[in-house]
Swiss-Prot record:
Gene3D superfamilies the UniProt entry points to: 3.40.50.20, 3.40.50.880, ATP-grasp fold, A domain (3.30.1490.20), ATP-grasp fold, B domain (3.30.470.20), Carbamoyl-phosphate synthase small subunit, N-terminal domain (3.50.30.20), Carbamoyl-phosphate synthetase, large subunit oligomerisation domain (1.10.1030.10), Methylglyoxal synthase-like domain (3.40.50.1380)
Main localization of the protein described in the UniProt heading: mitochondrion
Pfam families given in the database record: CPSase_L_D2, CPSase_L_D3, CPSase_sm_chain, GATase, MGS
Protein name from the UniProt record: Carbamoyl-phosphate synthase [ammonia], mitochondrial
Record-linked SUPFAM superfamilies: Carbamoyl phosphate synthetase, large subunit connection domain (SSF48108), Carbamoyl phosphate synthetase, small subunit N-terminal domain (SSF52021), Class I glutamine amidotransferase-like (SSF52317), Glutathione synthetase ATP-binding domain-like (SSF56059), Methylglyoxal synthase-like (SSF52335), PreATP-grasp domain (SSF52440)
Region entry Anthranilate phosphoribosyltransferase homolog, spans: 39-218
Transit peptide: 1-38
MGS-like domain location: 1355-1500
Glycosylation sites: S537, S1331, T1332
Top-rank taxon, per record: Eukaryota
Post-translational modification: Undergoes proteolytic cleavage in the C-terminal region corresponding to the loss of approximately 12 AA residues from the C-terminus. Acetylation of Lys-287, Lys-603, Lys-841 and Lys-1291 is observed in liver mitochondria from fasted mice but not from fed mice.
Record-listed N6-glutaryllysine modification sites: 55, 171, 176, 207, 210, 214, 219, 228, 237, 280, 307, 310, 402, 412, 453, 458, 527, 532, 553, 728, 757, 772, 793, 811, 841, 856, 875, 889, 892, 908, 915, 919, 1074, 1168, 1183, 1224, 1356, 1360, 1479, 1486
Domain remarks in the Swiss-Prot or TrEMBL record: The type-1 glutamine amidotransferase domain is defective.
């Protein structure tokens, strides 16, 4: 029977796709569906028919004529105009693996260069017989484009169809070998034709002799076997007078300085006249150099006496790695051949190059004569230019004269690597998460440890981030020793002394590790202790970090950077700006995430930003602003053998002026021509080589949108956020490979772990596209603008994978915010646009909501040209965004009866969710899902394999798409699903990734198959070797159900990923998903604060007076009855979103409005706020209502500070035993009442012996990693075993009856804040969480542990003066603290009233003026001046709600933060700090394992 596959169709870009039931490997089905009208003229249907009977339907965008030929595929990521005009494709129907073709339109096909050759093409026209693509972009945009790709194909009468699952087609060709095929239109039947039986070389060769570069000194005869124009250009450029002769021309009697044979298509063995002519040359006495390219390699080999064969799988693409056998140098090459030489080379000849992947011949050379040939294309176009140097070698042979061999003129390798002999390596982590330095370093550090262990190298890890996976002390993938200590030169030196490592890795710990390593180098510590920095040298790091050195280095190789000056004073900065001209950009040296950077349109802005920058660094760069240019990034890997690959290139949708961490980013780049792509790639490689990078680095470019002008912005000589994104986008494990390279292992010897077969020395091909969208939480920070710029503000990000931009873009928007349906003019969290919205300003000034403003502008019919003018976003992206809104409008005009299958399918293919569609059609989400499934529309599961299906893959790295026709995998494992945490944001950070990874690892240790779903590229849980199947997908009801049912999972764990998966518990349960652990109905009861409080009353468990309120009047009545302050809490939220302590009626009105918006479906609970109480955390694991593991930790701060911002102590330090017993008893009752089986957390207020419950979360909490590591019991391991019904030995667990309480050490967990990045935010703690990360350290007592933890957050112990500003009510308690600080030798400053009070109580203090009163009293110094000149290096600012000087206190806090000065705003923390400084004069470098060893020794 005939096998027919209906093609995918995709919106305006002419696409449409159809999902089908599970397919069998035999592909025995027959589907046929009508196309839909998308353009003004309905696209004609056509079929691609293969000789094995496979028939796939598509839609025409070329010439509507049938054609037959050989079907081949190309995995290149760009350069389709060059590829289509490559004569080597003569007679072939080309399948493009790149999922979107036509973005850049077609260039001027009549334009000629100075040689008379077609300027933008590789021959005189399109040479492919036909073209097959998945998605065709009819809307195009490029400054060189003159028409669409479809118009060009029609002009040249070449058929082309879109809507074919090209990945599926590639797999058929890969598995069965290249095969004959035909594109057939109805009524135009054609027979199969085998072009390999034709002498295609004769068809494409010139018919006459032609001369190019007439008068040039070197005469080169070029035999045209289908030569590409670029070969001629490169020869003339080097001084050749090129005589282009037909393939059968007798050149044996011609005089020449060099002979070149290049091409071409078909079977070279059919070109017998040419082979005989070459044979005459080889056997004659002629010694002029001969250079063969592609077909020329086989022609030369056949002439020499070797044999050729047709390859089962041709090499066609732009990422083929070849190895020079003579010197082990590897190169990435462009290839296009289906025949190869075998290993029958005669005497006198030997191989020159070999393919690293399939070991086929890639070049030959004569051992004594100047004859050589290569199978790949050194002239490229399209493709990488790595081997263009072979043309130089050819000319060197010509100049050297006769009798020279190619090896004598090939460039020698710059480096020859040797294995770095190290036995123990110290890896520096990045510390707690902060804006600009987040969870990506947990991922990279974990990969580095894994790589070292594979090579039998011992590892010592130093990282105080206790929530990270890498700091686990037990496990096959963990370091041999873990130090929870500050990443500072002092502590690293102590660890080096104690551990005596012989190697040090700096590139896996972000800017923190890099800066620390540079300082250790400068101090001579590394030299003193014989520690080698592995990978990139410190000198190279300094050259990338020091702005002047960086500029000098690039000038050495004449590379393009923006005109700039590195300055070390504000005066010089102003002079530099005057020289360059405004606007200018400033950047700080040794800074992270654009900290200390900004665009300065004028002198005033420069003074403001420059002053703040100099507070953080001693050097800034003032450079020309390239705002509005495109921002392009490359991730480059270089080994110690000087082999270089560019693993991924990425394009920022937002133009220059927005930090890449705050930009929407796509991979691969979508709007670059081949010339632009390769220009920037070549520059990347040159720069990385010149800087001496060994390992991985990121290079960022600004590219002019309408010319080839570019400049280098910066190089990061380390793993970065972009590196993590590139790793997850491509499947190429950059950190793992970089760690191997650091040991001196060359790239060709490292395996590609995804394919399991090929080498890591390659550049991934993507047959999908990725969109990254940042996650901001700017609303949490009072006073912070939503504007974004060159200094990063986002706290996390998501990555979505699709096969159209629209699909991945809409998925990413939903991943970022569960409240967002897709690309829509509605703001996240259902917020309203302001009534006085200035839409043009919203577009021209980038902000965290600009993407929604673009949707609003499109909805308002603003022209694309106007949006381009205001945003500088490439028009191609805006076309796609417009297509989404057009579909939205179409759907809104339909209902469930009138919506056709084609329209519904098209909506799904461009990323519409069921929920999104339901709102348009007036249905529920469940009804839309039912409608979709009824129409047999469902998604397909595809693999990320790094190779665009070119090689069979063992990968378990998956995504879901509606743009396909088959699944890539089988679904026969029925694993347990684990839901990850989604994007990092305030309140959900790396601790939930730790929980997910712990659960996954436990399941695998128990022999259970795992299916993980997450969408965060910074996580370890999205490392594909952590689980059995990884779905990089949305954490939405729709997508989880899709995957759960497709995989037929045995259950789903939702309690280890934080609030996002927890919120899905009830909806999943109602849709038949088996939720492991505590019943979702119980979770719902606990999450609804009013129900939970009612249950506590029934249990007679004490809590503060409370009331669930639905109206403002109810809230005001309750507050008046119990008295202010009150605590206002919405339900189903994480990290205290919209939670506030309310002190007045006005605040109640304001906060209640916000709370109802955050949690609209649930009532808000008001509780009487208990002042002066201490908060206690109970982290526990329940088993069928019994508590089998628990840990009790105490907050340093009194209640009122969110638990995520609190400083935790374990064991408790001030809580009475009586209160602890009450905490345990309440926990016991709650566990039983809610029948808890799994992890949970209860928060209590303790005041004396009174214990009140605050709230309970029936899921893992952010303190689980902290308590697990401190007590040495993995609570998530225990919880996972409970949830799946595994038996547990409870004797070793910290039960309520037999707690584990450390007696020889104290653990302190401290929060990390990112205030310097959040310009204008008030750095003070409230009920709503503000911290971005956490650290933990250990000490024999609370004081040493506390100081280590504070130092780990970047806190600097003051050396000079302390500014004290306290509200009057704090005075009685604060006097003792002030005395302690004075006795420790600190000079105290205070505002007038506080100063008078301190002096009156015999504590000397210098009075200073409030900021608002500066200059009024000449005898009072300016606080801001004292802070900025370093006289004050700690600010203690303790206001409360009754403070009069609200704004002054804010200015003081903000000045401290902006000046890089330590700031304390909580009395209890200040008190503990004063005690710690007094009692711990020195801080040791002991960590957890030291204390554990001591405890074990005592017990023994």
């Amino acid at each position: 029977m005939t096998r027919i596959l209906t093609a995918c169709k995709v919106v305006k870009t002419l696409k449409s796709g159809f999902g089908f039931a599970n397919v069998t490997t035999k592909r025995q089905w027959d589907f046929s569906r009508p196309g839909i009208r998308l353009l003004s003229v309905k696209a004609k249907t056509a079929h691609i028919v293969l000789e094995d009977g496979t028939k796939m339907k598509g839609y025409s965008f070329g010439h509507p004529s049938s054609v037959a030929g050989e079907v081949v595929f190309n995995t290149g990521l760009g350069g389709y105009p060059e590829a289509l005009t490559d004569p080597a494709y003569k007679g072939q129907i080309l399948t493009m693996a790149n999922p979107i073709i036509g973005n850049g339109g077609a260039p001027d096909t009549t334009a000629r260069d100075e040689l008379g050759l077609n300027k933008y093409m590789e021959s005189d026209g399109i040479k492919v017989a036909g073209l097959l693509v998945l998605n065709y972009s009819n809307d195009y945009n490029h400054w060189l484009a003159t028409k669409s790709l479809g118009q060009w194909l029609q002009e040249e009468k070449v058929p082309a169809i879109y809507g074919v699952d090209t990945r599926m087609l590639t797999k058929i060709i890969r598995d069965k070998g290249t095969m004959l095929g035909k594109i057939e239109f109805e009524g135009q039947s054609v027979d199969f034709v085998d072009p390999n039986k034709q002498n295609l070389i004769a068809e494409v060769s010139t018919k006459d002799v032609k001369v190019f570069g007439k008068g040039n000194p070197t005469k080169v005869v070029a035999v045209d076997c289908g030569i590409k124009n670029n070969v001629i250009r490169l020869l003339v450029k080097r001084g050749a007078e090129v005589h282009l002769v037909p393939w059968n021309h007798d050149f044996t009697q011609m005089e020449y300085d060099g002979l070149l044979i290049a091409g071409g298509p078909g079977n070279p063995a059919l070109a017998q006249p040419l082979i005989q002519n070459v044979k005459k040359i080889l056997e004659s006495d002629r010694k002029e150099p001969l250079f063969g390219i592609s077909t020329g390699n086989i022609i030369t080999g056949l002439a020499a006496g070797a044999k050729s064969y047709k390859m089962s799988m041709a090499n066609r693409g732009q990422n083929q790695p070849v190895l020079n056998i003579t010197n082990r140098q590897a190169f990435i090459t462009a290839q296009n051949h289906g025949y190869a030489l075998d290993n029958t080379l005669p005497a006198g000849w030997k191989p020159l190059f070999v393919n690293v992947n399939d070991q086929t011949n890639e070049g030959i050379m004569h051992e004594s004569k100047p004859f050589f040939a290569v199978q790949f294309h050194p002239e490229v176009s399209p493709g990488p230019t790595d081997t263009e140097y072979l043309f130089d070698s050819f000319f060197s042979l010509i100049k050297k004269g006769k009798g020279t061999t190619i090896t004598s003129v090939l460039p020698k390798p710059a480096l020859v690597a040797s294995r770095v002999e190290v036995s123990k390596v110290l890896i520096l982590g990045s510390g707690g998460l902060s804006i600009g330095q987040a969870g990506e370093f947990d991922y990279s550090g974990s990969q580095a440890v894994k790589a070292m262990k594979e090579e039998n190298v011992k590892t010592v890890l130093m990282n105080p981030n206790i929530a990270s996976v890498q700091t686990n002390e037990v496990g096959l993938k963990q370091a041999d020793a873990v130090y929870f200590l500050p990443i500072t030169p002092q502590f690293v030196t102590e660890v080096i002394k104690a551990e005596r490592p012989d190697g040090l890795i700096l590139g896996m710990g972000g800017q923190t590790a890099l800066n620390c390593g540079v300082e250790l180098f400068k101090r001579g510590v590394l030299k003193e202790y014989g520690v080698k920095v592995l990978g990139t040298s410190v000198e190279s790091i300094m050259a990338t970090e020091d702005r002047q050195l960086f500029s000098d280095k690039l000038n050495e190789i004449n590379e393009k950077i923006a005109p700039s000056f590195a300055v070390e004073s504000m005066e010089d900065a102003l002079k530099a700006a005057d020289t360059i001209g405004y606007p200018v950009m400033i950047r700080s040296a040794y800074a992270l995430g654009g900290l200390g950077s900004g665009i300065c349109p004028n002198k005033e802005t420069l003074i403001d930003l420059g002053t703040k920058a100099f507070a953080m660094t001693n050097q800034i760069l003032v450079e020309r602003s390239v705002t509005g240019w495109k921002e392009i990034e490359y991730e480059v890997v270089r080994d110690a053998d000087d082999n270089c690959v560019t693993v991924c290139n990425m394009e920022n949708v937002d133009a220059m002026g927005v930090h890449t961490g705050d930009s929407v980013v796509v991979a691969p780049a979508q709007t670059l021509s081949n010339a632009e792509f390769q220009m920037l790639r070549r520059t990347s490689v040159n720069v990385v080589r010149h800087l001496g990078i060994v390992g991985e680095c990121n290079i960022q470019f600004a590219l002019h949108p309408t010319s080839m002008e570019y400049c280098i912005i910066e190089v990061n000589a380390r793993l970065s956020r972009s590196s993590a994104l590139a790793s997850k986008a491509t499947g190429y494990p950059l950190a793992f490979i970089a760690a191997k390279i650091a040991l001196g292992i060359p790239l060709p010897e490292i395996k590609n772990v995804v394919s399991g077969k090929t080498s890591a020395c390659f550049e991934p091909s993507l047959d999908y596209m990725v969109t990254k969208i940042p996650r901001w939480d700017l609303d949490r920070f009072h006073g912070t603008s939503s504007r974004i710029g060159s200094s990063m503000k986002s706290v996390g990000e998501v990555m979505a994978i699709g096969r159209t931009f629209e699909e991945s873009f809409q998925k990413a928007l939903r991943m970022c915010h569960p409240s967002v349906d897709g690309f829509t003019p509605r703001l996240p969290m259902n917020k309203e646009w302001p009534a006085n919205l200035d839409l043009k300003k919203e577009l021209s000034e980038p902000s965290s909501t600009r993407i929604y403003a673009i949707a609003k502008a499109l909805e308002n019919n603003m022209s694309l040209d106007e949006i381009v003018r205001l945003t500088s976003i490439d028009k191609w992206f805006l076309y796609k965004m417009r297509d989404i809104l057009n579909m939205d409008k179409t759907l809104k005009g339909l209902n469930s009866d009138s919506v056709t299958e084609e329209t519904l399918r098209k909506a799904k293919e461009i990323g519409f969710s069921d929920k999104q569609i339901s709102k348009c059609l007036g249905l529920t989400e469940a009804q839309t899902r039912e409608l979709r499934l009824k129409k047999n529309i469902h998604p397909w599961v595809k693999q990320i394999d790094t190779l665009a299906a070119e090689y069979p893959s063992v990968t378990n790295y998956l995504y879901v798409t509606y743009n396909g026709q088959e699944h890539d995998i089988k679904f026969d494992e029925h694993g347990i699903m684990v839901l990850g945490c989604g994007p990092y944001h305030i309140g959900s950070s790396v601790e939930f990734d730790w929980c997910a990874v712990s659960s996954i690892r436990t399941l695998r240790q128990l022999g259970k198959k795992t299916v993980v779903v997450n969408c965060n590229p910074e996580t370890v849980s999205t490392d594909f070797d952590e689980c059995d199947k990884l779905y990089f997908e949305e954490l939405s009801l729709e997508r989880i159900l899709d995957i759960y049912h497709q995989e037929a999972c045995n259950g789903c764990i939702i309690s280890v990923g934080g609030q996002i998966p927890n919120n899905l518990a009830v909806p999943l349960y109602k849709n038949g998903v088996k939720i492991m652990g505590t019943s979702p109905l119980q979770i719902d009861r606990a999450e609804d604060r009013s129900i939970f409080s009612a249950v506590l009353d029934e249990l007679k468990v004490a809590q503060a007076p409370w009331k669930a309120v639905n109206t403002l009047n109810e809230a005001l009545e309750f507050a008046n009855s119990v008295g202010y302050p009150c605590l206002l809490r919405p339900s189903y939220v994480l990290s205290g979103s919209a939670m506030n302590v309310v002190f007045s009626e006005d605040e109640m009105k304001r906060f209640l409005e916000e709370a109802t918006r955050v949690s609209q479906e649930h009532p808000v609970v008001l509780t009487k706020f208990v002042e002066g109480a201490r908060e206690v955390e109970m982290d526990a694991v329940g088993k069928e209502g019994r508590v089998i593991s628990h840990a009790i930790s105490e907050h340093v701060e009194d209640a009122g500070v969110h638990s995520g911002d609190a400083t935790l102590m374990l064991p408790t330090q001030t809580i009475s035993q009586g209160a602890i017993e009450k905490v345990k008893d309440a926990t016991r009752k709650i566990a039983k009442a809610f029948a808890i089986s799994g992890p949970f957390n209860v928060q209590f207020l303790v005041k004396g012996n009174d214990v009140l419950v605050i709230e309970c979360n029936l899921r893992a909490s952010r303190s689980f990693p902290f308590v697990s590591k401190t007590l040495g019991v993995d609570f998530i391991d225990v919880a996972t075993k409970v949830m799946i019904g595994e038996s547990i030995d409870e004797k070793r667990l910290p039960t309520l009856e037999q707690p584990i309480i450390p007696s020889d050490y104290v653990a302190i967990k401290a929060p990390m804040f990112s205030w310097p990045r959040l310009r204008d935010a008030d750095p003070i703690l409230r009920c709503e969480m503000a911290s971005t990360g956490e650290v933990a350290c250990f000490g024999e007592g609370i004081h040493t542990a506390f100081l280590k933890a504070m130092l780990s957050t970047g806190f600097k112990i003051p050396q000079k003066g302390i500014l004290i500003g306290i509200q009057q009510s704090f005075r009685p308690r604060f006097l003792g603290v002030a005395e302690q600080l004075h006795n420790e030798g600190f000079k105290l400053f205070a505002t007038e009233a506080t100063s008078d009070w301190l002096n009156a109580n015999n504590v000397p203090a210098t009075p200073v003026a409030w900021p608002s009163q500066e200059g009024q009293n000449p005898s009072l110094s300016s606080i801001r001046k004292l802070i900025r000149d370093g006289s004050i290096d700690l600010v203690i600012n303790l206001p409360n709600n009754n403070t009069k000087f609200v704004h002054d206190n804010y200015v003081i806090r903000r000045t401290a933060v902006d000046s890089g000065i330590a700031l304390l705003t909580n009395f209890q923390v200040t008190k503990l700090f004063a005690e710690a400084v007094q009692k711990s004069r020195t801080v040791d470098s002991k960590s957890l394992f030291h204390y554990r060893q001591y405890s074990a020794g005592k017990a023994a």
